[in-house]
């Protein structure tokens, strides 16, 4: 059910986020994530911070990749061209040709498969898998908070996060040119449940010292 899939684009990502991520040892990738655990199935699509040492961090340019983490095989990465003009056109053309071949041979092949399978026992329905709500998923987060440039603002931000039991793991706050009216406070948090982060961001956004939209980028799971 794709209607239940959480999807977030990249429009909120700025060049400064890429630079801050690099300083923190990460790269920003737009990921589709599926995790099956005892709690159920997590499915989501959003920008994520990937450690520079991770396999996915090396996927660049027109390359796309699928990383699979399993108990038996550990981490495996499958990559190939699939983004950009020529690479996308090639992939689409391959799909069209494959579909055309399937349609052309469908009648004979379908009849043959029906004869082969009619005596086979039918498989039962797949077991239901519970879906983990986005609000219940825990992630470490990168927060870029635009604030007025005056003393005491960071203490306000830290207090608001602490009120929601969110720990600060790293901070970047750079001096801005005198002509700039605002300054960005960049914070890396511990792993926190999504609903808690949302509540904290709502409180932060209500502060009169926060002067713009807060950017939040989740850290990709490292199973």
Placement of each model-derived feature along the sequence:
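Glycine-rich phosphate/pyrophosphate-binding beta-alpha loops
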Residues: 52, 75-86
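Short acidic, glycine/serine/threonine-rich loops at helix termini
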Residues: 80, 90, 104
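Conserved active-site and cofactor/substrate-binding residues in soluble primary-metabolism enzymes
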Residues: 5, 9-16, 60-63, 83, ...
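Short gly/pro-enriched beta-turn/loop segments at secondary-structure junctions
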Residues: 61-63, 71-73, 136-140
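A conserved regulatory-domain signal marking ACT and ACT-like small-molecule sensing domains
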Residues: 96-223
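An anion-binding loop in the catalytic cleft
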Residues: 68-79, 93
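Substrate-binding/catalytic subdomain of NAD(P)-dependent oxidoreductase enzymes
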Residues: 1-58, 63-65
């Amino acid at each position: 059910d794709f209607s239940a899939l959480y999807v977030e684009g990249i429009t909120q990502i700025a060049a400064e986020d890429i630079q801050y991520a690099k300083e923190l040892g990460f790269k920003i990738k737009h990921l589709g994530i599926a995790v099956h655990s005892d709690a159920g199935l997590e499915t989501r699509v959003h920008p994520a911070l990937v450690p520079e040492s991770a396999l996915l961090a090396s996927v660049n340019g027109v390359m796309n990749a699928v990383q699979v983490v399993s108990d038996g095989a550990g981490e495996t990465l499958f990559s190939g061209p699939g983004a950009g003009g020529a690479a996308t056109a090639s992939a689409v053309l391959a799909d069209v040709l494959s579909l055309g071949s399937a349609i052309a041979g469908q009648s004979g092949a379908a009849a043959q498969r029906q004869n082969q399978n009619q005596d086979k026992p039918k498989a039962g329905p797949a077991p239901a898998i519970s879906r983990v709500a986005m609000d219940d998923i825990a992630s470490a987060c990168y927060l870029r908070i635009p604030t007025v440039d005056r003393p005491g603002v960071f203490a306000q931000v830290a207090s608001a996060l602490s009120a929601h039991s969110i720990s600060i793991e790293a901070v970047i706050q750079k001096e801005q040119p005198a002509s700039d009216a605002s300054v960005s406070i960049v914070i890396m948090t511990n792993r926190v449940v999504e609903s808690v982060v949302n509540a904290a961001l709502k409180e932060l956004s209500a502060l009169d010292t926060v002067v713009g939209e807060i950017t939040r980028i989740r850290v990709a799971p490292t199973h």
